[in-house]
Design a protein with these regions (language model features):
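Extended, structured, electrostatic nucleic-acid-contact surfaces
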Residues: 17
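Anion-binding and metal-coordination hotspots
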Residues: 1-11, 20-465
């Protein structure tokens, strides 16, 4: 914190050496510099440091390891605003407002200005007419004990209160944007599930999704996102990196949290080799997975007939196709398959087990939904990550990308932001990232590892992988 830095500048000989005899800065000056000056150019400084490390041949432009973590906001933990709750209360309040406006129109003998639903603009127009009427009648607004308000004054005050409430709902929804929640004391923070759940009740806390890219142990880029999951952060983060560094890395290595058809097709279109572990990679080799006969992965696919053969040898034929729009706006083409010979099948219970069925077992028929493009991209990923190079890159991702977070969160104790707002928390992390890079460069010099970019697989690790 800024107060700790101020105290160290006065008491720590290392800080005094860096000051070179100058007066120790005030904590307010440090905080002002961080939020008002450094925050505006933090991305530029991070990019310049990365370019300098490339010039020193400490960072390569071939591969980059990406990982994300959630860091708690400085906001109070119970200052939540939920988008669904606001939307529900807004709709309920609009119904009450419609009744209020209807009564006022009858009393004041005005013409209705809406057709189906009362909106904020209608309340404004009626309020304007009532104020004009009050001016014509030279109405004196009164308040307090011993004063009796006229009906016109009461109607005007009721509409003003309703208008303020509608504005409050609109403001909350505007702050939420496409998020599901925000914190009152830090509107840029979003409520997310955190790993450190001390209450063991799945408590949500205001936090930021922090993404960083690592190469040769150095943090080369970072980004702050409101998404609780990593899958929707990859595209904007890579675009941000390309804008800042003026080039794109040749290979991207991520964990299973980034796998989606949108991300894989995006990387293919940009000519970037993706080493992203499929989400079902750990399950697909287990005995339990192999025994689940209802999964399409355990069925034989006939490419010529475009159908699947189930465990009983029946054909699950193509029944149609559809276009599905995801939350990010990406349109996915899906092919639907259905079997018409499920009656009396001895494997029906195992094939169509599950709790989400609305029909009884006797009336069920096997259906499959498949994205051909995603299946093709996933097969490509399997080939890449199971190659010798893929195993090596996966090992380096766990060492380098997660190691960077281990150094900053574990060793430095950085688990909660001190600042508020996207720009300020990003600047705060960039300071940590730059400090990490300087410390890592010093460590490489001291240990004579300036040429180390990738760790090599050991023989036993190769066999295990």
């Amino acid at each position: 914190s800024s107060r700790t830095i101020e105290k160290n500048c006065k008491r720590d000989i290392n800080y005094m050496y860096l000051l070179e005899g100058r007066k120790a800065p005030d904590h307010a000056a440090i905080a002002r510099f961080r939020s008002k000056h450094f925050a505006k150019c933090a991305r530029h400084f991070m990019a310049q440091m990365t370019k300098f490390l490339i010039k020193l041949e400490q960072v390569t432009t071939t591969e980059v390891f990406i990982d994300g973590t959630k860091i708690e906001s400085a906001a109070n933990r119970y200052t939540f605003v939920w988008r669904k709750a606001v939307t529900k209360h807004q709709a309920r309040f609009l119904q009450k407002t419609a009744l209020l406006v209807g009564d006022i129109i009858q009393r004041q003998e005005l013409k209705p200005l809406w057709q189906k639903q009362v909106k904020k603009k209608h309340v404004k127009k009626i309020l304007k007419k009532l104020r004009a009427k009050a001016n014509e009648e030279s109405l004196e607004f009164v308040s307090g004990r011993g004063h009796i308000k006229t009906q016109l004054q009461r109607d005007i005050e009721a509409l003003e209160a309703a208008l303020e409430k509608l504005k409050e709902y609109e403001k909350k929804l505007h702050i939420c944007a496409d998020r599901g929640s925000y914190a009152k004391t830090d509107p840029d923070a979003t409520f997310m599930h955190m790993k450190d759940d001390h209450m063991l009740n799945g408590q949500l806390k205001p936090a930021y999704n922090l993404q960083h890219a690592v190469n040769s142990g150095f943090i080369v880029a970072a980004g702050i996102f409101p998404n609780p999951t990593d899958v929707m952060t990859l595209k904007p983060f890579l675009n941000q990196m390309e804008d800042d560094l003026s080039f794109a890395f040749e290979r991207i290595v991520c964990d299973a949290g980034y796998e989606s058809e949108e991300n894989l097709s995006f990387l293919r279109a940009k000519g970037i080799e993706a080493y992203i572990k499929p989400a079902n990679y750990e399950q697909i080799g287990t005995k339990k997975f192999a025994k689940e006969i209802g999964r399409k992965e355990n069925m034989r696919y006939d490419k010529e007939q475009d159908c699947y053969l189930c465990h009983n040898g029946k054909e699950i034929k193509r029944s149609g196709s559809r276009r599905v729009k995801t939350a990010s706006g990406y349109i996915r083409e899906e092919t639907q398959y259905a079997c018409s010979e499920c009656g009396g099948c001895p494997y029906k219970e195992k094939c169509m087990s599950g709790k989400n069925w609305k029909k009884p077992l006797e009336e069920r028929y096997k259906k499959l939904t498949v994205s051909r493009l995603f299946e093709e991209l996933r097969e490509e990923e399997y080939r890449r990550i199971n190659s010798e190079e893929g195993k090596k890159l996966r090992m380096n991702r766990s060492i380098q990308a997660e190691g960077g977070f281990a150094d900053i969160k574990g060793d430095s104790g950085f688990t909660r932001f001190l600042c508020k707002g996207n720009e300020n928390v990003f600047a705060e992390y960039i300071l940590y990232a730059m400090a990490h890079n300087l410390g890592w460069l010093h460590s490489r010099i001291q240990n004579d590892k300036l040429d180390l970019h990738l760790y090599e697989l050991k023989e036993d690790e190769t066999e295990a992988a």
